[in-house]
């Protein structure tokens, strides 16, 4: 889904599995557009029996449903109050420094990629490469939005980097 599913789509998917599958149903939600927790909880509400998550959403690019947030929501859903002290201590002592070092998690570029069904690796590559400034990243996203970017291809990234779709301005003319 590239992280772009919404709760209505989750309900449709879970119901399709419930009607055609006798095994357990679960969800692994990406957080490109900040929907991972809501989508995970919708899947639980619709009958999913397991939910995948990672501490602080750790994962490639925008990451996944965050275990700490999911734990809070599941407690509310099940009217529980589990002790989260050890989890929060683990986050503060180990995962927060790792997240700072490796920079996973949602941002505006991943959100746009999710919205336009663009593979998150394009964003991951651009934000880790100093050749790309904000205008370059937006230009590449716009190119991929029009040309398609569901699967990552480094050659397409290079082509998109040099593609300019705006109106040229200036007075210089070759002689």
Where are these regions (language model features)?
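Catalytic cores and adjacent flexible loops of soluble metabolic enzymes
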Residues: 1-175
């Amino acid at each position: 889904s590239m992280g772009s599913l919404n709760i209505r789509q989750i309900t449709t998917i879970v119901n399709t599995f419930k009607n055609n599958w006798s095994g357990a149903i679960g969800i692994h939600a990406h957080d490109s557009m900040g929907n991972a927790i809501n989508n995970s909880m919708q899947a639980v509400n619709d009958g999913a029996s397991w939910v995948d998550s990672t501490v602080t959403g750790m994962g490639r690019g925008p990451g996944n449903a965050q275990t700490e947030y999911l734990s809070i929501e599941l407690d509310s859903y099940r009217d529980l109050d589990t002790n989260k002290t050890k989890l929060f201590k683990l986050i503060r002592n180990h995962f927060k420094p790792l997240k700072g070092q490796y920079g996973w998690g949602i941002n505006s570029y991943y959100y746009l990629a999710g919205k336009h069904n663009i593979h998150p690796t394009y964003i991951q590559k651009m934000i880790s490469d100093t050749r790309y400034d904000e205008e370059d990243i937006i230009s590449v996203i716009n190119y991929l939005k029009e040309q398609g970017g569901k699967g990552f291809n480094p050659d397409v990234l290079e082509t998109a980097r040099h593609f300019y779709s705006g109106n040229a301005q200036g007075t210089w003319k070759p002689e």
